[in-house]
Curated annotation (Swiss-Prot):
It comes from Paraburkholderia phymatum (strain DSM 17167 / CIP 108236 / LMG 21445 / STM815). InterPro entries: Ribosomal_uL3, Ribosomal_uL3_bac/org-type, Ribosomal_uL3_CS, Transl_B-barrel_sf. This is Large ribosomal subunit protein uL3. It comes from the Bacteria. Part of the 50S ribosomal subunit. Forms a cluster with proteins L14 and L19. Belongs to the universal ribosomal protein uL3 family. Residues 133-145 have a biased composition (Polar residues). The gene is rplC.
């Protein structure tokens, strides 16, 4: 139950420390997270904040959503996202408020959720890193096949969960414990250490890390 930010993946680059070390980072644009609704236990049964990100023409918004946004005095966005928070945090926010990059700080660990790049229909070698068959020595037409998928007459079926060919990618993926390497407050950018799922321009959700790793040897 933590407040987060909705953003857009700009791409990857690298930054350098004072010692000259190169750090690969992903640049995230988290500008203009506008609060559209505060949900409370009394009105909705739980406590949450709904935010809008990006911009969208008014003509591309349904009338019910247009009324919802007009009530909050917020411009239409590309996406609406809800973050469940506690009542104390919800009391600090109001409809129409803007949540900025100051929500996070340099060195903080965050979880970033995005949609992985779709690969289409893929075989088991690409999808699950299976080994291919022999190129020769009697193998004529079984170079990239997965092999046997079942058993004999008993049990006479393919077990659920068997790794086979199928659609690969285009899934919701969360990368945990990424460190914020730098914050550009003027351009409203977060630079997180490491890779983030999705293609350039893809939507991402940034929240404080849930499973922070303990430092070995720390008391």
């Amino acid at each position: 139950m933590s407040l987060g930010l909705v953003g857009r993946k700009v791409g990857m680059t690298r930054i350098f420390t004072a010692e000259g070390d190169s750090i690969p980072v992903t640049v995230l644009d988290v500008s203009d997270n506008r609060v559209t609704q505060i949900k409370t236990v009394e009105t909705d049964g739980y406590t949450a904040v709904q935010v809008a990100f990006g911009t969208r023409r008014a003509s591309r918004v349904t009338k019910p959503l247009a009324g919802h946004l007009a009530k909050a005095g917020v411009q239409a966005g590309e996406i609406l996202k809800e973050f469940q928070i506690d009542a104390a945090k919800a009391a600090e926010l109001s409809s129409g408020a803007v949540i900025g990059v100051d929500l996070f700080e340099v060195g903080q660990k965050v979880d970033v959720q995005g949609t992985s790049i779709g690969k289409g229909y893929a075989g088991t070698i690409k999808r699950y890193n299976f080994s291919s068959g022999r190129a020769s020595h009697g193998n004529s037409r079984s170079h990239n096949v997965p092999g046997s998928i079942g058993m004999a007459q008993d049990p006479g079926r393919v077990f659920p969960g068997k790794r086979m060919t199928g659609h690969m990618g285009d899934e919701t993926v969360t990368v945990q414990n990424l460190e914020i390497a730098r914050i550009d407050a003027d351009r409203k950018l977060l630079l997180v250490k490491g890779a983030v799922p999705g293609a350039k321009g893809g939507k991402v959700f940034v929240t404080p890390a849930v499973k922070t790793r303990a430092v070995k040897g720390a008391k």
